[in-house]
């Protein structure tokens, strides 16, 4: 659905660097699952139905941003201060 090479470009990770490929694939799958569970609608490449959503560029960018956040922040993130 979202190709690994596109994720690597988004993250500015060299395509020849393969050490994180398995982890990035997990993040791709988790981002898609997060979208589907939040919206209660499965993502599809084509042929939408009453419930299935075609992955648009806007959805793809949102998923890439989520993957990027998870990749760069592997632990909990706190915004603001006390």
Where in this protein do the model-derived segments appear?
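Divalent metal-cofactor coordination and adjacent catalytic microenvironments
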Residues: 1-82
